């Protein structure tokens, strides 16, 4: 069966932004204008199509990325029909993981900013993630009808705070309640959308006289940006100072695809102005699956390889999200990078080493589904019937095995103990938590060995609230939740050499493992700029510790790292070098050397000046000027370090670094200080040493 839409007419895009920039409303309008939903769902009515979980509709925020397929032929029907697969991503910092997963499988993104608040903390996080995956993007400055909205100010903020080369392709006509429409800088015409039909039709009129000069200045900057795409365009521009509309599109597209520039559009999704122009921008400037570099992967032997985006290549797809559906059970969302998959086909999962059969394939529209017979390169769809797949697994052809890059997921920073309200629910709770953990890799579940309690960990208080809420609604398990606990870590501060000997020789075969290990602080970071946890170096010469036991020493040290040495918290930032030792021909074993390794760390870390680390959060508080002093005083009392201040239309913005341990219940507190007018957001920044008096308390409570 041939393809319905040619691959170059595909656009796999994400819509990402900070909470409240109007991202879900923008997506709703896209679905309305592309003809998918006949009635527009408003977020503040709790009726948005993409926000399909009950909690999302109650809280008015998007938690999980819903995926939707839609079609667009242009505002003036000027394009052939393009297929747009859209992923709507959450903007709350506790759900960064959902954004990370979506960006991993997208080819392009529309980043939405609020016209009055501009660049906010989550916008920076999203931008960093998009940079990490090299995702070309365009910007939509939304809410131009809001008080304090200023398109050019937001573009300037994107330049300075996100270090992005922003090129406006539009200019707003009026702002706040006078926002009327936009100037198209390529056609040099004003676009006025018709309010009677919710912006379905529009007229092109002359540019208002008072904006003519500014529009011409911005047009020149835009043409210069387009001309820099190639020598031919630059020559033509230098000779005549002008480029045709097609040449401008061609130049801008080439530079967006190379991640050299970011085009800026503006409008108000809520007022039905500007969204169709953004759709034209998606088709014109964002890449098709075969216009981005071939996906990198590895063969089974760990050799680097790549897969072109083509139906003729062997099948390869990435499972980027799991969801539990009340009617069909487990849904596995996949992005197909190459080849074709038909329902009923068997696929191989090289990460698990298992073969599975795909029962049915469905195309999702938020939480409604259409069954389809097959998916091809470039498609995003959900499979039903896969049992043993986790987020980040590769699915491929068993005859041609590849492993697509693994996704890196952040470590949780907050934990709470949960217990079912009735003993009868214990098993139900275990099943529910297991399913939720399979869906969300930034959520972890473990049993505390000492207390026997179930401990759940995640990215923030809201994240864990929603998990407990979903247990109640979807799995009918009522639970009691303990006070939040901080995910402390331990590390060492100095270099030490440690001998450890494990010897058991009392009749029969004994045990003998003897090692000398040098421990020192590890100051290395991984490719994401995060501190490395552990590095093991083998410097043994002359076979004093036989090759087959060296891995066991490393394993023993690594297992002991998980238990810590001061207060039972996992250790990070440790480099261990095995440089000497001895063995016994008969009594030595892998187990003996593993125990010797763990003994070496236990003894050595105490001498190496071990200390406790705590998560430090980057906190941004927006407060009216009147409450500035009180809010800053409160942050100082919480051991906060004020890093700087900015202004924005709603008041002052305080940037601070504050220990997570001091931030519990802050939301209620900051509301009462400011009579409900201040808001804040926070994300994990780094681990730092805990002050001695607090470290003593932590150790004391662990030992008691």
UniProtKB/Swiss-Prot annotation:
This is Elongation factor G. GTP binds at residues 17-24, 88-92, 142-145. SMART domains: EFG_C, EFG_IV. GO terms for biological process: ribosome disassembly. Residues 8-290 form the tr-type G domain. Catalyzes the GTP-dependent ribosomal translocation step during translation elongation. During this step, the ribosome changes from the pre-translocational (PRE) to the post-translocational (POST) state as the newly formed A-site-bound peptidyl-tRNA and P-site-bound deacylated tRNA move to the P and E sites, respectively. Catalyzes the coordinated movement of the two tRNA molecules, the mRNA and conformational changes in the ribosome. GO terms for cellular component: cytoplasm. One of its GO terms (molecular function) is GTP binding. The keyword Coiled coil does not apply. It is found in: Cytoplasm. Belongs to the TRAFAC class translation factor GTPase superfamily. Classic translation factor GTPase family. EF-G/EF-2 subfamily. InterPro entries: EFG_II, EFG_III, EFG_III/V, EFG_IV, EFG_V, EFG_V-like, EFTu-like_2, G_TR_CS. Its main location: cytoplasm. PROSITE patterns: G_TR_1, G_TR_2. Pfam families: EFG_C, EFG_III, EFG_IV, GTP_EFTU, GTP_EFTU_D2. Keywords: Cytoplasm, Elongation factor, GTP-binding, Nucleotide-binding, Protein biosynthesis.
